Amino acid sequence: MTKHYPKLLLLILTTAFCACKQPSGQSSTALADYLKDSSAIPRTGGIQMIKINTPKGKFNIWTKKIGNNPKIKLLLLNGGPGCTHEYFECMESFLPAEGIEMIYYDQLGCGNSDNPKDTSMWELPRFVEEVEQVRQALKLDSTNFYLLGHSWGGILAMEYALKYQKNLKGLIISNMMSSCPDYGKYGEEVLAKQFDPKVLARIREIEAKKDFDNPEYMQLLMPNFYAKHICRFPVDQWPEPVNRSLGKLNHSLYVTMQGPSEFGIGGNLTNWDRKAQLKNITVPALSIGAQYDTMDPKHMQWMATQFKNGSYLYCPNGSHMAMYDDQLMYMNGLIKFIKGVDAGEKSVKL
């Protein structure tokens, strides 16, 4: 038997080496299927432009698919309102290795999509119908459609679920409370009190004069608010995808819906509140909260108790961009939730 030992050892080592090269949980066949692009020629690297109908005419919406999984398709709704899909790019370092198909989507007025430059179109009900038209064009349905909304995207995702949850398999609300008045209250009663009193007084003075274009306003907010509650890195070390997305912010869209102040909401979302309707969301739903967020993590935890099949993910080191500043907690929890729902779980312990 000894004369066959070198060949046997070589076979074992070769097999082990090949096995180690595969991403977690994926065989070579599964990986090939995930990476395969069967779209029509000429192929565009997963990009699909979708023409939507609106009360003001037809417009083009930009989407990009990464990967291929007929059972798990995650559509990403960016925040702002008015940011772009780009700050979600960190997910490419985690989700493809788990076989999760992810779909970027720039909402109307954002990024690579058309910008009608018409403030009358920045209304929540119209955005809900836009998401539904995008879903139809991408052929997503209740067997595979997971919807993740972050910040403003969370408002949009909740509204979509309340009207169209029959099309969903799973819902993820990331870093967004279910009430804008409660969000404003948290900002005033909790976050504002964490400021240096002199800094806060100067910010209040600028806001009272509605002098939001004053460079001093952002100079005060960046180190005292953004670096503590939006993304917990020194501002000069913020991740490039975050800077790129914020650099393309549609200010008209942002101010119309959010308002010019960073403390609470003063635009047409001011009175938005869906606390009483959360119980009507019956699909598996995950809420994600973070300790240092602009959103109250206790409210996010409460939301999970209101959904019929709710789960909660807490990011103890995270802020509003917890997918960056508490990245492993965020990504591992998100993946565990999606895979749990795919396996038939209604709520997932995280």
Residue ranges and their predicted role:
Residues 194, 201-279, 283:
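Alpha/beta-hydrolase
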Residues 143-186:
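Conserved hydrolase catalytic core segment
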Residues 37-60:
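N-terminal cap/lid segment of alpha/beta-hydrolase-fold proteins
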